[in-house]
Amino acid sequence: EKHKTEIFSQDDHSFVLKRTLDTTVYYVSVKYEGKAVLSEKEKHYLVLTPESDKFSFVCEFTDKAPAKLNNNTNEAFEASSQYWTAFWEKGGAVDFSKCTDERAKELERRVILSQYLMAIQSAGMYPPQETGLTYNSWFGKFHLEMHWWHAVHFALWNRADLLERSMDWYAQAYPVAKQIAERQGFKGARWLKMTDPSGTEAPSKVGSFLIWQQPHFIYMAVLF
């Protein structure tokens, strides 16, 4: 069977699941505090049920068999607190408190919330998906049309390091982009709208012909 979910290892307070789908394999490590029971309701559907009113756990996804988790929830909360404190103290901010328009407070709230949502959903090692992690649009893949819209603002908010994370993808995909350009009769590199982590062409009726994503890389590079 090509789709499997297995209990890779388990003890009194932790377990590791091995997930396999075709040639893709990843591991889910969970460490919890307190008593709990892990049960399988059906294929690929496991439930961890606490046996007390107070329960906490940490979870990690890895592409290789992991070492045992050593951290706990207190450490996770502390690391999160330190990260977001640094995030807000480093970047730009807005203050509409002097605005007389009655919509100013709501607009400020949305600007601040958007900074947070874009940081958690669009600042990874690959160009972001159109709907981030909230929804599963565009076949679950990123497409280069939206890289500018979803990542350029990081540099303008003085958080260029978050944009830089996904810029390396262009260098990794360059050999494939050069081959695509040659195939289509162009010089240089051809960044396709519909692509994937490897840089190859993803299925699309019009993706092969669209060019509006071509200058994004140049524009973003100037921001550094």
Model-derived regions, located:
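Aromatic-rich carbohydrate-recognition surfaces in CAZymes
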Residues: 139-224
